[in-house]
């Protein structure tokens, strides 16, 4: 059962920047899930298995489709996922990585582990402040 979650919508708003959905599921399913959760409008684009010509994560080909389409520098992107093999692929391409998982030790290729996506704004802004010495208003690690 899917539910609308105010904390998730609030976190997506606070993150700012360009947000993309990259899913191995079919487009119609992804759109239905995002709609049911009330969060579709917070994403700039949705990339489904069809969008990547059936090259699912963790294939680098799918990541390249997104990065080319949006002219993204991988070193200025954060990839959030719950699957370690997808995070490992993203890290090899130069993206910062966030693993959504319970209390498990994180591998070296994971930059940040959170229990919930709703924690992202707090962690990303804190990390950016430590890295630059000044408050961050948006952007990846």
Where are these regions (language model features)?
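Short, acidic loop-to-helix structural element flanking the phosphoryl-transfer center
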Residues: 1-21, 27, 31, 60
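Asp-based, Mg2+/Mn2+-dependent phosphohydrolase catalytic module
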Residues: 13, 26-27, 32-141
């Amino acid at each position: 059962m899917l539910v609308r979650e105010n904390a998730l919508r609030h976190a997506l708003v606070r993150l700012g920047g360009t947000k993309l959905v990259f899913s191995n599921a079919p487009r119609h399913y992804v759109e239905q899930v995002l709609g049911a959760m009330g969060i579709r409008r917070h994403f700039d684009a949705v990339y489904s298995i069809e969008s990547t010509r059936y090259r699912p994560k963790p294939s680098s080909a799918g990541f390249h489709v997104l990065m080319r389409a949006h002219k993204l520098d991988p070193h200025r992107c954060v990839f959030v996922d719950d699957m370690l093999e997808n995070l490992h692929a993203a890290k090899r391409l130069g993206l910062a990585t966030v693993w959504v998982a319970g209390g498990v030790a994180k591998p070296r290729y994971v930059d940040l582990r959170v229990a919930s996506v709703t924690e992202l704004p707090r962690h990303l802004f804190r990390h950016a402040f430590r890295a630059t010495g000044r408050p961050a208003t948006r952007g990846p690690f």
